Amino acid sequence: MQRAGVNPTFTWTPTAQTKIKLSYEYFRDYRTGDRGIPSQNGVPYDRAAPSTFFGNPALSNTPSTQNIVTALVDHKFDDGLNVRSQTRFADYKRFYQNVYPGSAVSASDTLTLSAYNNSNDRQNIGNQTDWTKKFSLGPTQHTFLFGTEFANQKSANARFSGFFTNNNSTTSTAIPASNPVSWQNV
């Protein structure tokens, strides 16, 4: 697993009543997707070490990145009214593919491998604005809150089944459970 991220933030206070905050976040995650140990007769296959990989680790990667920009403006008026508005744009890219046990281990100690890949790209933009007013009415203190929120999201998703090169027409291939790592091209 490899992860890295940064989130620099800049805050500017042009007046005692106004604060502006800008931030950018970048995050990257790369890991191998492991679907675990298959079962045999309804229990985990017990002839494999817990660290055994069933499938193909070189073809089971799950990289993702995210880029997020946020702007926040907070202003307090002299009459007790406060306005706080935050806008955020986010761009997410995620891809994962997996060569994994597609069946339980049979009585003859074989299993089938299956494969797929999936991509998911998403962009969000949104704004949340709150108006808050504190006031007294007789001996009672009140807080009045009014807010709006707007958002838009666009996504592009794709999913594909893997085909194995042993005949290039099936979405699974049989392997011995004693040698569960398959380096066949998918």
How would you describe each model-predicted region?
Residues M1, L22-R28, S85-D91, F146-N152:
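Transmembrane beta-barrel strands of outer-membrane/channel proteins
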Residues K19, N82, Q141-L145:
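Outer-membrane beta-barrel architecture
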Residues G80-V83, D130:
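Transmembrane beta-barrel domains of bacterial outer-membrane proteins
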Residues R122, G126-V186:
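C-terminal low-complexity, acidic/polar tails when present
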Residues V6-K76, G80, F89-R122, N168-V186:
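Acidic/polar loop-and-plug regions of large Gram-negative outer-membrane beta-barrel proteins
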Residues A4-N7, I68-T70, N127-S136:
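Short alpha-helical segments and helix-capping/turn motifs at coil-helix boundaries
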